Amino acid sequence: MDQPKAVAPNAVVEIKTPTGAPVRIGNGEKLSIIAGPCQMESRQHALETAHALKEMADRLGVGLIYKTSYDKANRTSANAQRGIGLKDSLAIFQEIREVTGLPTLTDVHETSHCSIVAEAVDVIQIPAFLCRQTDLLVAAASTGRAINIKKGQFLAPWDMKNVIAKVTGAGNPNVMACERGASFGYNTLVSDMRALPIMKEIGCPVVFDATHSVQQPGGQGTSSGGQREFVPTLARAAVAVGVACVFIETHPDPDNAPSDGPNMVPVKEFEALVANLLRYDALTKAA
């Protein structure tokens, strides 16, 4: 079988929507948003959250991709809730696209899941812990879907050039690099804003994950902690530096969420946060 031809990364990744204009993700484009709850808890929860985010995105005039995870395979504890699973989630992802018009994103942990997930979502995300797994990157790239790669907490930003090359080397130019903090001692992450312009030099859109950047990995013993009060601060800083997209996990009741509650933004606060980020984005990109 012929090997795929290596390509350069696209400066702008277009994510088609079921009913409207595509979401254009590019470092020089208007800010776009990836948002949704950490994990898919139920059909009702997923649809209600997606509808709320769609309404806010329409009011703000911002391109939004709905994200949620069918399986949180890297939870701190083996006893932690992981999500509803691949089989039960596929129809829900498709329903979200059909009834809201939002494109969708989810993360994969297994090479065998990539082609299955690609039938139901628009963007495949590679978790930070798995960002150097060549077989997973190639399997995801081979689906033809856009790929969002979380930079590992253990990687320097310039090391993402080799990670991105695994996707483009498989013939897929639609790839994004996502900053989500770097390990800074035990149970702590820090966001180095120098990473954003460094990763831009790769030539792909750069995403800033504002919620996992405030995570405290394993900080609660059997689960991760977080400091959601710093999400707006870090998000504003990233947008002031200049990014293509901001990733924000949001939940109607984060304090009672099954995972990542301490760093998720309440849905009721989401619209004001994004409205403020759009003002920063307009100033940054007008300069």
From Swiss-Prot:
One of its GO terms (molecular function) is 3-deoxy-8-phosphooctulonate synthase activity. It is found in: Cytoplasm. Keywords: Cytoplasm, Lipopolysaccharide biosynthesis, Transferase. It catalyses: D-arabinose 5-phosphate + phosphoenolpyruvate + H2O = 3-deoxy-alpha-D-manno-2-octulosonate-8-phosphate + phosphate. Its EC number is 2.5.1.55. Pathway: Carbohydrate biosynthesis; 3-deoxy-D-manno-octulosonate biosynthesis; 3-deoxy-D-manno-octulosonate from D-ribulose 5-phosphate: step 2/3; Bacterial outer membrane biogenesis; lipopolysaccharide biosynthesis. InterPro entries: Aldolase_TIM (IPR013785), DAHP1/KDSA (IPR006218), KDO8P_synthase (IPR006269). One of its GO terms (biological process) is keto-3-deoxy-D-manno-octulosonic acid biosynthetic process. It holds the Pfam family DAHP_synth_1. It comes from the Bacteria. GO terms for cellular component: cytoplasm. It is an enzyme of class 2 (transferase). Belongs to the KdsA family. This is 2-dehydro-3-deoxyphosphooctonate aldolase. It comes from Caulobacter vibrioides (strain NA1000 / CB15N).
